[in-house]
Design a protein with these regions (language model features):
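Domain-level signature for soluble enzymes in the chorismate/prephenate branch of the shikimate pathway
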Residues: 1-262
Length: 262
């Protein structure tokens, strides 16, 4: 199999899916990876699930995702007071999946805060902030007593009873050896999940080098309790439900998903 151009989100939650990949990997934020995958600058990428909903021509690596079946911890709205009193929420532009999940949840609950990209205007309204990934983890640990945290994974589970799929391995349709790539990625996931202590040790060492303290106990709980790495029947149902709600609320055309699985 020839070398392929692989991209991956640069968050702790992706480590069990990429650690040990034998070739070069280009790490970036989800939105940047989606753009590069669309342009053909990458052939394979672990990107936001919304990218597949928007462009379902990609093939999906079956049985692999970043998902949650309840609280995810690292996709949250930080706010003070009741969420129903929040007048503005500052969005995180790094992930369209998180932004559109938030839009769906708010719409289904009948909440109508103003959603802003960038620093909100000084309107005097109570504010919230959507935070994702490692930034959300650090923010929660540094400001645990100063804010309340509306966990989008938890709210999705309450609303639908289903898991939520945040990211998928997508392969461009013209890549000839997609089945071989998918098989290697599934095998890599299985190897890493069998060795979570090594994943945790690497993560602790890396964040220590960057002067960012993330306790080992938290990481162990994060990988075992908050995250799921499969893409089975219930995850597919969750993704279809997300697509349905995005269609209902005008974020996507209404259509049934056809999963091009490899």
């Amino acid at each position: 199999m020839k070398s392929v151009r692989v991209g991956c989100v640069k968050y702790l939650n992706a480590r069990p899916l990429i650690r040990g990949w034998p070739g070069n990997v280009e790490f970036d934020h989800p939105s940047a990876l989606c753009q590069r995958l669309t342009k053909g600058q990458l052939e394979v990428a672990l990107v936001s699930s919304f990218e597949f909903l928007r462009n379902p021509t990609y093939r999906i690596v079956n049985d692999v995702s970043i998902s949650s079946d309840g609280p995810v911890y690292s996709v949250v709205v930080a706010h003070r007071g009741a969420l129903s009193d929040v007048g503005e929420i500052e969005l995180d532009p790094a992930s369209e999946t998180a932004v559109n999940l938030l839009r769906c949840l708010l719409a289904e609950l009948g909440l109508t805060p103003r959603l802003t990209r960038g620093t909100p205007e000084n309107t005097g309204l109570p504010r919230g902030r959507l935070i994702i990934g490692d930034q959300a983890i650090r923010f929660r640990q540094n400001h645990a007593r100063a804010f309340q945290f509306w966990d989008l994974g938890e709210q999705w589970k309450r609303l639908t009873g289903l898991p939520f799929v945040y990211a998928l391995w997508l392969i461009r349709p013209e890549v000839p050896d997609a089945k071989s790539i998918a098989q290697r990625l599934r095998g890599l996931r299985d190897e890493n999940l069998a060795g979570i202590p090594a994943i945790v040790s690497d993560a602790v060492a890396d964040v220590a080098d960057n002067k960012q303290e993330v306790p080992r106990e938290f990481l162990d709980r994060y990988y075992h309790k908050h995250l799921r790495f499969g893409f089975g029947t219930r995850e597919k149902q969750g993704l279809q439900t997300f697509a349905d709600l995005c269609g209902k609320h005008g974020m996507l055309p209404k259509r049934a998903l056809e999963f091009g699985l490899v």
